[in-house]
């Protein structure tokens, strides 16, 4: 009955039923979404949220799925992906990007227009929406340094503007994590620069990233937040956990702050390995690591042997 109603209310919207999320995540793990939706514009997005709210169905936006782990039991209700909301425009020294825009590609737009300030993000996988939500950063730069404002979707399906000063930015944190609002688009203030110098800096940062990070395997990016006065990777190395493996997921031998899916690992492998590393590092150094990666969805129901 509800499927008929959904087909009528959301006619023309790209919706996939019982769709495995591991097809879309950087980790290559994750169970099915009841309904996976790809809105083409804000009008379709509003229709999806309105339908979900009216039918008491949970909904969430799954950005670019780069810095998160979806559990093997999947996600109930609607999962919304912004892949088709990806327009980027340049007006003077301001770049406006829709939430589904690829972060790395957006830094290339800035480079093409000789605008400086976005170089730090040139190798960070993910979407603009996720980058604002997490206050993504690297090599001394972060989104909070350049954001002007963001248009966000409230849980009621309304769109409003939040100025950068009201984002309550912190280390890998924004107010959006507290109120569960979702970025629809964001404006960034950049400065005029020299194309060659910008290009050289982006090349340098990408070279550093390739040297230090395990880009050859699926991963969820940096797993842990930087603990005060320490480096997570260093603490993990000191606990002799490089190469430590559970199932198909292991602590990278290239950078201990990363976990890589080397042999068809599961979300449970990731979760168990994260918990084990936290426990062992605490035992070894007394420092409690805090995950930077988000873990969402339901655990897989294990069938008991009769």
From Swiss-Prot:
* An example molecular function term from Gene Ontology annotations: FAD binding
> Which domain of life does the protein's organism represent?
Bacteria
Protein name, UniProt field:
UDP-N-acetylenolpyruvoylglucosamine reductase
To which species is this protein native?
A: Streptococcus mutans serotype c (strain ATCC 700610 / UA159)
Pfam families reported in the protein's UniProt record:
FAD_binding_4, MurB_C
- E.C. number: 1.3.1.98
Q: What is its main location?
A: cytoplasm
Q: Where is the active site?
A: 172, 222, 292
């Amino acid at each position: 009955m509800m499927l008929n109603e959904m087909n009528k209310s959301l006619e023309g919207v790209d919706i996939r039923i019982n769709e495995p999320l591991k097809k879309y995540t950087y980790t290559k793990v994750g169970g099915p979404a009841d309904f996976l939706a790809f809105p083409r514009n804000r009008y379709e997005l509003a229709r999806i949220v309105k339908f979900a709210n009216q039918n008491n169905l949970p909904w969430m936006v799954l950005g670019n799925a780069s810095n998160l782990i979806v559990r093997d039991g999947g996600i109930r209700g609607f999962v919304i992906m912004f892949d088709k909301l990806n327009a980027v425009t340049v007006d003077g020294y301001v770049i406006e990007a829709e939430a589904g825009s690829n972060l790395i590609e957006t830094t290339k737009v800035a480079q093409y227009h000789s605008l400086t300030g976005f170089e730090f993000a040139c190798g960070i996988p993910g979407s603009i929406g996720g980058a604002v939500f997490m206050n993504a950063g690297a090599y001394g730069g972060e989104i909070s340094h350049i954001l002007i404002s963001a248009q966000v979707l409230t849980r009621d399906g309304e769109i409003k503007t939040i100025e950068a000063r009201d984002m309550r930015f912190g280390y890998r944190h924004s107010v959006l994590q507290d109120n569960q609002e979702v970025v629809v688009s964001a404006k960034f203030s950049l400065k005029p620069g020299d194309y060659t110098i910008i290009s050289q800096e982006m090349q340098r940062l990408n070279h550093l990233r390739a040297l230090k990070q395990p880009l050859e395997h699926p991963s969820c990016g940096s797993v842990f937040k930087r603990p005060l006065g320490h480096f997570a990777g260093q603490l993990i190395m000191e606990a002799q956990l490089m190469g430590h493996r559970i199932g198909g997921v292991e602590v990278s031998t290239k950078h201990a702050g990363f976990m890589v899916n080397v042999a068809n690992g599961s979300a449970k492998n990731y979760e168990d390995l994260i918990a084990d590393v936290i426990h062992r590092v605490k035992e070894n150094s007394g420092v409690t690591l805090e995950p930077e990666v988000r873990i969402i969805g339901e655990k897989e129901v294990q069938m008991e042997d009769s």
